[in-house]
Amino acid sequence: MTDTPDQHEHTHEHEHHHEHRPLDYTEAVEAFRAEKDDYFKNAGAGSPIPVAEREAFTGLPYFPVDLALRFDDSVLEPYTGGEPSNFQIPTSDGRLRPAHRAGILAFEIGGERRVLTAYTFDGGDGESLFVPFLDATSGSETYGAGRYLDLDPEDDGRYTLDFNLAYHPSCVYDIRFSCPLTPAENRLPIRIEAGERLSPTIQVQTLDAGA
């Protein structure tokens, strides 16, 4: 069992090459997804896909890659909300995990400014950010308790907020995994049609959204 946000981060593009040319962004994301699918199918006890479903597993479904939902050079702004900076975030197995509201990340979709709170955990490096979120696809095309983003700083200290890398927590598929529940403050009132979708062929666990 793990109490980390997830065992498989989606924050790094892989430097693969085909016919001696660099992959473009869409190809890089698709290559990363293929590697994750291979891990889920073949990782043995490390895979969250139920053993009985692994043989038939052909990969997770995703929204098409959309560059409009990748926000480069995002600055971590100070958190100015009314909630305490230090708090206990509930997990899928009923525990509480010490967390910190590190700041907010702002972005614009459809001409409107949106924000998500970014979190860090006790014992982390203090720079890597955990950004869980809910949106208008949650509970239908995507998991009802939200999806995750893991962000590492660039060399200049800024972040890339890329919804194409949004993923479901492992506890979606296997209750052995302990996953933080998405705080209600990170509910977006719009559809984020990027990242992982729910698979119609894999049974998912049930969690409440908006901790």
Regions inferred by a protein language model and the residue ranges of each:
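Extended, aromatic/histidine-rich regions of cofactor-dependent oxidoreductases associated
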Residues: 3, 26, 158-159, 167-211
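Histidine-centered metal-binding segments
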Residues: 3-20
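Conserved "landmark" site that anchors the functional core of diverse proteins
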Residues: 22-93, 203-205
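Extracellular/lumen-exposed scaffold segments
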Residues: 51-57, 84-92, 96-101, 158, ...
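Terminal leader/tail segments of proteins
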Residues: 67, 84-87, 126-127, 154, ...
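Short helix/loop capping segments that flank catalytic or ligand/cofactor-binding pockets
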Residues: 80, 116, 140-142, 169-172, ...
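Mid-length scaffold segments of soluble, non-membrane domains
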Residues: 90-144
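Acidic, glycine-rich flexible loop segments
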Residues: 135-167
